Amino acid sequence: MSEIKLIVGLGNPGDKYADTRHNAGEWLIERLARRFNFNLSVESKFSGKTARAVISGQEMRFLVPTTFMNLSGKAVSALANFYRIPPEQILVLHDELDFSPGIAKIKQGGGHGGHNGLKDIIAQLANNKNFYRLRIGIGHPGDKNLVASYVLNKPSPTDRQLIDRSLEEATDCIEILMKEGITKATNRLNAFKA
């Protein structure tokens, strides 16, 4: 049933960044790995950690680029090209400044909104913006000059709790996506607020 064949979780590599807001996409992949019992392993030809799982009879590939965020497109395009997965069958999980913690939404297409990971993915997919995005709200520092340090810092315990609740709902919705399709998953997730 799933129209999605590749799920990508964005983040920066290394322990220094593991708990920072910019790694919210990777946090969601980690939850999916626990839910669906798969392990990511490093595949250097894809510049990332990858896994393959069959869920509800659907083959799904998972990717966490091991490059820094602004080079995420290299991994996405390498894996998508190798397995002939078109952009319309890719779901990218990423942090979203424009949503408060506790909100997550799915959408298809659009620009990068200043997100350097999305910017590079769009560029590496030959400017094709038609991939899906699951945007995980992390809140905004209020001043655009503070954004760079904000995304590279840990959320407050209260914000982390709200983000975790949205990640739990997103995990449920990705399971729905695999069984019943992206429209049903989108409608449910986009109505959720922790």
Curated annotation (Swiss-Prot):
Can you tell me where the transmembrane regions are? none
Q: Which GO terms describe its molecular function?
A: peptidyl-tRNA hydrolase activity; tRNA binding
Q: Which UniProt keywords apply?
A: Cytoplasm, Hydrolase, RNA-binding, tRNA-binding
Report which superkingdom the organism of origin falls in. Answer: Bacteria
An example of a Pfam family matching this protein is Pept_tRNA_hydro
Show the Gene3D superfamilies listed in the entry: Peptidyl-tRNA hydrolase
Catalytic activity annotation: an N-acyl-L-alpha-aminoacyl-tRNA + H2O = an N-acyl-L-amino acid + a tRNA + H(+)
A GO CC annotation recorded here is: cytoplasm
Top-rank EC class of the record's enzyme: hydrolase
Q: What does the record give as the function of this protein?
A: Hydrolyzes ribosome-free peptidyl-tRNAs (with 1 or more amino acids incorporated), which drop off the ribosome during protein synthesis, or as a result of ribosome stalling. Catalyzes the release of premature peptidyl moieties from peptidyl-tRNA molecules trapped in stalled 50S ribosomal subunits, and thus maintains levels of free tRNAs and 50S ribosomes.
By sequence similarity, the record places it as follows: Belongs to the PTH family.
Q: What is this protein called?
A: Peptidyl-tRNA hydrolase
Q: Which organism is it from?
A: Histophilus somni (strain 129Pt) (Haemophilus somnus)
What's the gene?
Answer: pth
